[in-house]
Amino acid sequence: MTWEYKVSTGILSHNGKLIAYCYSGAGESKDKPNCEHIRNKGPIPRGVYFIAGWNNHKSPAAIILEPIAGTNTFGRDHFEIHGDKKGQPPGTASAGCIIMNGQDKRQTIYDSGDTILVVR
């Protein structure tokens, strides 16, 4: 089955079940699909992504997302699902990544075994 993230609402779901409210993008571009082309400001571009693994670079249990062929990323890259950054105001950590707080929730994504995320 698949994971789904809806940019305009911030809803992350798995097989139709609400998992978390998230955000993507920064400032005036946050959660606005029509800003997906703006580097370091717009939300993650709509398309299909492979859940490729995890790392602890941006936050514990950050999920690595790789676009699948046919997904237009507008030359943008290094998308992840990670948490807000410590020492910064909440809601300001995204330069295009999906921000979902709660390491346990991110671990659930990875542990699910489902490796497809559809961004709408």
Could you tell me what each predicted segment is?
Residues 1-77:
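Gly/Pro-biased beta-strand-loop elements
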Residues 48, 53-120:
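Exported/periplasmic cell-wall-interacting domains
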